[in-house]
């Protein structure tokens, strides 16, 4: 049983891994003994994160623009040069945008669909050879998509691109899970509620007290909460789970 939740020796790629949810997951993997690659748009941020996490484990950073297929293919090529196999892919890179309905720019919709939905699609497809190479009997390769509870319910804020793209990512997760199972790859999604991050900073500043009051567990998510669910899905403990969309929100989704 001591190895049930182990990810030691596994190779993981976490996109958007230099801050927020992605950094929480990357740090958890590194501290648990995985070899972690983080990807973000700026090489400086990747280098800083790699230096920090390498104090706890092994971490390498790659700059990547995942808002288009070419950037996803380029990242996959970098990873392929470095590793013969990839055990865990975490599609976390994403963006948000809020504006009144009458003012929401079309360019913002394009950006969010490209990064939040098409990015995970293109990157997963490009990395299939490395994921398949990691498959072992009883130990599938894992894809973990980071969605949102805003993709499970209708949010009160006018995030006209964000919430629909996260709902789409959840359904993409289910489709990939069905079709990749025969190739030894599980695909699941985490749907975070409120966590401390740059994306959530303004919302928590303005509404943090009311969010806590409305949360059945009475608090904001902590890094260990996010690392824990990712390690579960990436370990032997989660090997029989695929196609799941798991809220990690302190119970908020039960109240909506």
What are these regions (language model features)?
Residues 2-4, 153, 231, 242-256:
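Short C-terminal tail/terminal secondary-structure segment
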Residues 181, 186, 241-243:
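Short, small/polar-rich loop/turn modules that mediate ligand/substrate recognition or access, typified
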Residues 148:
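Residue(s) in the substrate-gating loop at a strand-loop-helix junction
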Residues 11, 18-19:
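Conserved glycine-rich cofactor-binding loop
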Residues 124, 165, 173:
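Active-site helix of classical SDR
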């Amino acid at each position: 049983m001591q190895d049930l939740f182990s990810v030691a020796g596994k190779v993981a790629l976490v996109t958007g891994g230099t801050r927020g949810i992605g950094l929480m997951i990357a740090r958890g993997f590194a501290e648990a003994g995985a070899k972690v690659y983080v990807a973000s748009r700026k090489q400086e941020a990747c280098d800083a994160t790699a230096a920090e996490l390498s104090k706890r484990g092994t971490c390498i950073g790659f700059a990547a623009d995942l808002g288009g297929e070419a950037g996803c293919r380029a990242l996959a090529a970098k990873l392929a040069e470095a590793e013969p196999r990839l055990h865990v892919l975490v599609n976390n890179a994403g963006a948000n945008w809020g504006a009144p309905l009458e003012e929401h720019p079309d360019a913002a919709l394009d950006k969010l669909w490209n990064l939040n939905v098409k990015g995970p699609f293109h990157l997963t497809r490009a990395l299939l050879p490395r994921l398949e190479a990691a498959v072992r009997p009883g130990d599938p390769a894992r894809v973990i998509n980071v969605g949102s509870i805003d993709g499970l319910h209708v949010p009160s804020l006018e995030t006209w691109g964000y919430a629909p793209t996260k709902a789409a990512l959840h359904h993409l997760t289910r489709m990939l899970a069905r079709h990749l199972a025969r190739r030894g790859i599980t695909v699941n999604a985490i749907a975070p509620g409120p966590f401390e991050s740059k994306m959530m900073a303004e919302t928590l500043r303005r509404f943090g007290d009311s969010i806590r009051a409305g949360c059945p567990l009475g608090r904001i998510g902590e890094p260990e909460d996010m690392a824990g669910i990712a390690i579960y899905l990436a370990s032997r403990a989660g090997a029989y789970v695929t196609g799941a969309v798991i809220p990690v929100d302190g119970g908020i989704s039960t109240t909506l």
